Amino acid sequence: MTMETVESQHDGSITASLTESKSAHVQTQTGQNSIPALAQVSVAGSGTRRGSPAVTLVQLPSGQTIHVQGVIQTPQPWVIQSSEIHTVQVAAIAETDESAESEGVIDSHKRREILSRRPSYRKILNELSSDVPGVPKIEEERSEEEGTPPSIATMAVPTSIYQTSTGQYIAIAQGGTIQISNPGSDGVQGLQALTMTNSGAPPPGATIVQYAAQSADGTQQFFVPGSQVVVQDEETELAPSHMAAATGDMPTYQIRAPTAALPQGVVMAASPGSLHSPQQLAEEATRKRELRLMKNREAAKECRRRKKEYVKCLESRVAVLEVQNKKLIEELETLKDICSPKTDY
């Protein structure tokens, strides 16, 4: 058998040659070693290319060797590698998601612990107010509403706290309630509640302030932000010269004794503009004109006095200069007398 016939058989049917070689090899094994081996088959794989088919070497009894290309191909390794890479990526993503969730849970726990350890504003305010005597401490009040969490406490904080010259502390709440604390009192027990009410009986522009009690001397003075009311004893009536004037941007208010229509313990305070009638305005204009004329007369007197002093100063200077002039004239005459005989010789 030549190489051309083997190659033609290989081109015709590779499968038939393989089956024949396998059957011949089986016959050699079962023939009790009486018949010599027909062919010796050895399989060798070519590693030149990735994924190339294996080559079978068939040795005939005559000593010829035939290269037969196998039909069965080796599995492609890239398929397994791609699947492995895919599984690794998915596992990494799952791990990152789990780690992110665990970190988020840890951060939320830490934040809750920090918030629970943080001191409340009421505690800070109570510590600050405990240093100053007479400042009322803010008490915590638990809210009874269903929607409010139990850890949240509500309190009524005054909008502003003022201290008078006598040492009293005045707290004005948002609802218009005024609380007065004496210097010797401690906490909320020394506070006096005042309620601002409006009435139609007083003239427009007036503000009514009602207070519960009075101090030992019977006089109370404090400032109310917004209306700027100055409250004093209800039995006293202030004259225009004793009008309570507030400093800064706070206007002046005059306190009048309560009328019969007002209840006991109510003081009416009105601004000066609302109390002026046309007659009072005319009197005020006359008073201002007289005051201006008086100031002009005083200024004219001062100007005349200064002019007289200036004239006297000038007269004294003229007298001094006249004396000096006379002395100079006498000296000049003496010099002339001394120099005249020398010129004659």
Curated annotation (Swiss-Prot):
Entry GO MF terms: cAMP response element binding protein binding; DNA binding; DNA-binding transcription factor activity, RNA polymerase II-specific; DNA-binding transcription repressor activity, RNA polymerase II-specific; RNA polymerase II cis-regulatory region sequence-specific DNA binding; RNA polymerase II transcription regulatory region sequence-specific DNA binding; sequence-specific double-stranded DNA binding
Chain segments carrying region Leucine-zipper: 314-335
SMART domains: BRLZ
Tissue-level expression: Expressed in testes (round spermatids) (at protein level). Isoform 14 is the major activator form in testes.
Alphabetically ordered keywords of this record: Activator, Biological rhythms, Cytoplasm, Developmental protein, Differentiation, DNA-binding, Nucleus, Phosphoprotein, Repressor, Spermatogenesis, Transcription, Transcription regulation, Ubl conjugation
Boundaries of every bZIP domain copy: 286-345
Matching CDD domains: bZIP_CREB1
Keyword Transcription regulation: yes
Pfam family, one: bZIP_1
Gene3D superfamilies: 1.20.5.170
Domain (KID) ranges: 88-147
InterPro entries with a match to the protein in the record: bZIP (IPR004827), bZIP_sf (IPR046347), CREB1-like_pKID (IPR003102), Leuzip_CREB (IPR001630)
Compartments (UniProt record): Nucleus
Major location (coarse): nucleus
Intrachain S-S bonds: none
Post-translational modification summary for this protein: Isoform 9 is ubiquitinated by CDC34 and RAD6B in order to be degraded by the proteasome.
GO CC annotations, alphabetized: ATF4-CREB1 transcription factor complex; chromatin; cytoplasm; membrane; nucleus
UniProt-annotated stretches for the region Basic motif: 287-312
Function recorded in the entry: Transcriptional regulator that binds the cAMP response element (CRE), a sequence present in many viral and cellular promoters. Isoforms are either transcriptional activators or repressors. Plays a role in spermatogenesis and is involved in spermatid maturation.
Family label: Belongs to the bZIP family.
The protein's name in its UniProt record: cAMP-responsive element modulator
